[in-house]
């Protein structure tokens, strides 16, 4: 392991800011950054070697790779965390605009849904990961929820019940089991989990398993997971309203009749609750408006 990779790993281990998932994501991003700096010719660095030229070269590379604004901003957050922990916060501009990083676009009428390809899923070697990915798309679960869920406990026949300890914000919620495909998937999940969560017994902690989970997904080309929640939201909207959402080419809110607007609002409220959001407005991110 190179010095910089080791130093950043130790920096993360000694500074436990945020949730377990946040810590794991940060460590993963910083390891990637260390590798990219090495590839760009910056050798023999340590955690205290970060300079403005390194930041500028990294951003130049990310922009050239046409990464999404959200991905770049997440990496910038990790860079700022690194700089702050080593007393060098002043070497990075406070605003991403200083580096011509575009603003993140939250609401569009373009679908970001990701349909899980059967061939890609079959390339995953850990059965519990296959199930988790399918649960994300079939029920709109977040990554952490799809891993921590205990299928036997969650299955209430006509719905899935998520414990507060599994969910973001600690909010218990229920998601309908409304199709034969969903029912079959829940039954498969119960067989794989054997009465426990979808974390295999050989992994000591959630964080240990999360690293393996991420590695397996990246190996087959899955680098982000939120698209699976988009897929659920858009399919659920179609089920509740009988039409496609704006992000899938359906009519926008301005094109709906008064009666259709009532149905649209009711569907968005239901989907918002099923996905663990407190506000109907957030559904515009998944469905368009």
Please name every model-derived segment.
Residues 100-119, 169-181:
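DNA breakage-rejoining catalytic core of tyrosine-based enzymes
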Residues 178-241:
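Active-site/catalytic core of tyrosine-dependent DNA strand-transfer enzymes
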Residues 221-265, 277:
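Short basic/aromatic active-site micro-motif
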Residues 135-159, 284-285:
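Short, charged phosphate-coordinating catalytic segments
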Residues 114-143, 262-268:
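Basic, Lys/Arg- and aromatic-enriched nucleic-acid-binding interface segment
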Residues 159-165, 249-289:
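Short functional hotspots where side chains directly engage DNA or cofactors
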Residues 9-104:
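N-terminal core-binding DNA-recognition domain of tyrosine recombinases/integrases
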